[in-house]
Amino acid sequence: MSGDHLHNDSQIEADFRLNDSHKHKDKHKDREHRHKEHKKDKEKDREKSKHSNSEHKDSEKKHKEKEKTKHKDGSSEKHKDKHKDRDKEKRKEEKVRASGDAKIKKEKENGFSSPPQIKDEPEDDGYFVPPKEDIKPLKRPRDEDDADYKPKKIKTEDIKKEKKRKLEEEEDGKLRKPKNKDKDKKVPEPDNKKKKPKKEEEQKWKWWEEERYPEGIKWKFLEHKGPVFAPPYEPLPDSVKFYYDGKVMKLSPKAEEVATFFAKMLDHEYTTKEIFRKNFFKDWRKEMTNEEKNIITNLSKCDFTQMSQYFKAQTEARKQMSKEEKLKIKEENEKLLKEYGFCIMDNHKERIANFKIEPPGLFRGRGNHPKMGMLKRRIMPEDIIINCSKDAKVPSPPPGHKWKEVRHDNKVTWLVSWTENIQGSIKYIMLNPSSRIKGEKDWQKYETARRLKKCVDKIRNQYREDWKSKEMKVRQRAVALYFIDKLALRAGNEKEEGETADTVGCCSLRVEHINLHPELDGQEYVVEFDFLGKDSIRYYNKVPVEKRVFKNLQLFMENKQPEDDLFDRLNTGILNKHLQDLMEGLTAKVFRTYNASITLQQQLKELTAPDENIPAKILSYNRANRAVAILCNHQRAPPKTFEKSMMNLQSKIDAKKEQLADARRDLKSAKADAKVMKDAKTKKVVESKKKAVQRLEEQLMKLEVQATDREENKQIALGTSKLNYLDPRITVAWCKKWGVPIEKIYNKTQREKFAWAIDMADEDYEF
């Protein structure tokens, strides 16, 4: 193209004085030649280029017509001046077009093509060509046609590349800033991606920033779909037999269903317990037909083996499911969750905790519960009480059924309730722990505990004075309060004998639950506690107490039998009334919450070293948490897989130690080479080996910390205190102060539950 231009230029200079018509013919030939070349390129380009071609042709026609009229006018001098100006513009345009062609070529090499922009031809041609030395490369002038230019279409493949890069970076969790900021401004996709997380944040209901409802009002609008009932019983296949006294016996559907509950637990320890077997057989017979009752009279003659094997095979089959089958089940569960797992409360979508009704089965209980083995009957719609607002759509019961009752009580937080048949207790469907109602309750609980901090010294002085009271009732109350404060004991509720497991709290302690030691293990005035607490978890502790407490306990135990109450003049009602007099809202649980939270805060201050790395700080946190769990007696049985997991962890530690030893040998060898060689390459090798050793040392330390943590916590339940007794703002403040990621302490569910604390607390927060 550039050669043709030079040839044309020289031709114009040589024939400058020739006839006007000849000049125009040459000029048009040149123009047509260029136009043909552009036409070839444009066949590959998009519709926009075609549009430019049509504009080009139109401009040529206009030019010809204008030429004719101007020649007819005969104003040749004026005409010549104009052509001088036009020729200048033409030369500039040709230069720009030549550079544009080179640019297009380069862009094609880079993986995308940009259609050449053909400008409209000038209205007239000139005859004067300026000297070559005056011609300078210029930027492409912007004219009206450029306003139609759309860079978004040209950079289509750029956008695709950028999208792909962004996706790859998001997968790695490292979203980098784009190198070319101008491109980002033109391309809308990345901007949309950046805005998505912000939208998610906006959707989170920051209820703690809103004005609270009047006392007692829990909500103003509540709508939900009701509960999901347990699926109906599916009879066993004919190939699965039940035997009684060695003979096959076909059971009625109701009797068979209850028999399957026992068969599923056949290998469990429960089915060997006499009380479990007795309660089960009694309730099973209630579901039998008269004929079955006459035949089945002894549980020991019943053979549930085939039933048990059938359910084991089903469990194994579920484990062996294909990915497609598992995905199908997951999708069905998600569909169910989407429909029934959420409610609308005060124009906000809130998650429901337990929207499924518990299926029928056998009651287990904790410890040696007197009712273990009894039949938990199937809950029907006729047992259900629905709670929603008056202006909400009442959920529809299953076809052929109706609800027991529909209420509109906005002073309670439950959505659905029913009464279970074992102990006659009321069961509820409630909102998820991350909901506003649950969050407000937690916040209020910790604020009450903080109020106790202001008057706890006064209360302690008061009960110390009461140890010397002339009234036995006051002395017993003061000693009980001392135990609740110092040992974080629960108050203990009064229970009907034979109805529940024999668990006790502070007020219900019996003489048999404590032993007094004037001196034990080098300590004076030691009280030895041994009783079953909540959930039949054993509380065993040896505690040195103040002398006056010890003397009072000796007095309380005088002339009493082991089964007699230690605090015979005290009950939970009397104690709670006294606590309310000391501070509004004060209960034994508030004392537990206060002591747990204050212990965590003190332990974190003592155990956290500023120069420790993150894993060491997390170990310090878990040790502080464990101190609280021990105080609150949050125990657990060691996991069944504990020994195996510890062996696996130890083998990892041993392997890491070997790797570290090898790395240290390599470093030593590299240092020796560096002393001899004394060049830059060997120095780099030494630095590389040093970094490898440091990395392995860190990895080994993490594994050792993990092993220590597991061993120390194998019988301690850290989660109970973390979720229920520790003010989360203490943890959040500690994380922010020491740069520990909150994800290392709280999992996703816990972060949702404590969103209010994470948003509210800063590093200077004090309980």
Swiss-Prot record:
Localization in the cell: Nucleus, Nucleolus; Nucleus, Nucleoplasm
Modification N-acetylserine, positions: 2
Record's miscellaneous remark: Eukaryotic topoisomerase I and II can relax both negative and positive supercoils, whereas prokaryotic enzymes relax only negative supercoils.
Subunit structure: Monomer. Interacts with ERCC6. Interacts with TPRN; TPRN interacts with a number of DNA damage response proteins, is recruited to sites of DNA damage and may play a role in DNA damage repair.
GO BP, sorted A to Z: chromatin remodeling; chromosome segregation; circadian regulation of gene expression; DNA replication; DNA topological change
Annotated Basic residues bias: 24-39
Gene symbol of the encoding locus: TOP1
Active site feature: 725
GO CC, any one term: nucleolus
Modified positions (Phosphoserine) in chain numbering: 2, 10, 59, 114, 508
Family: Belongs to the type IB topoisomerase family.
Crosslink position(s): Glycyl lysine isopeptide (Lys-Gly) (interchain with G-Cter in SUMO2): 103, 105, 119, 136, 150, 155, 160, 166, 174, 206, 338, 551, 644, 702, 714
Site, Interaction with DNA: residue positions: 318, 366, 414, 445, 503, 534, 576, 634, 652
A Pfam family the protein falls into: Topoisom_I_N
Sites of N6-acetyllysine modification: 174, 282
Catalytic activities: ATP-independent breakage of single-stranded DNA, followed by passage and rejoining
EC number: 5.6.2.1
Covalent cross-link Glycyl lysine isopeptide (Lys-Gly) (interchain with G-Cter in SUMO1) as placed by the record, residue numbers: 119
Post-translational modification: Sumoylated. Lys-119 is the main site of sumoylation. Sumoylation plays a role in partitioning TOP1 between nucleoli and nucleoplasm. Levels are dramatically increased on camptothecin (CPT) treatment. Phosphorylation at Ser-508 by CK2 increases binding to supercoiled DNA and sensitivity to camptothecin.
Listed Basic and acidic residues bias regions: 1-23, 40-110, 131-168, 181-201
GO MF term list: chromatin binding; DNA binding; DNA topoisomerase type I (single strand cut, ATP-independent) activity; RNA polymerase II cis-regulatory region sequence-specific DNA binding
SUPFAM superfamilies xrefs: DNA breaking-rejoining enzymes, Eukaryotic DNA topoisomerase I, dispensable insert domain, Eukaryotic DNA topoisomerase I, N-terminal DNA-binding fragment
Lineage, uppermost ranks: Eukaryota, Metazoa, Chordata, Craniata, Vertebrata
Annotated ranges, domain Topo IB-type catalytic: 434-767
Protein name stated in the entry: DNA topoisomerase 1
Matches recorded under InterPro entries: DNA_brk_join_enz, DNA_topo_DNA_db_N_dom1, DNA_topo_DNA_db_N_dom2, TopoI, TopoI_C_dom, TopoI_cat_a-hlx-sub_euk, TopoI_cat_a/b-sub_euk, TopoI_cat_euk
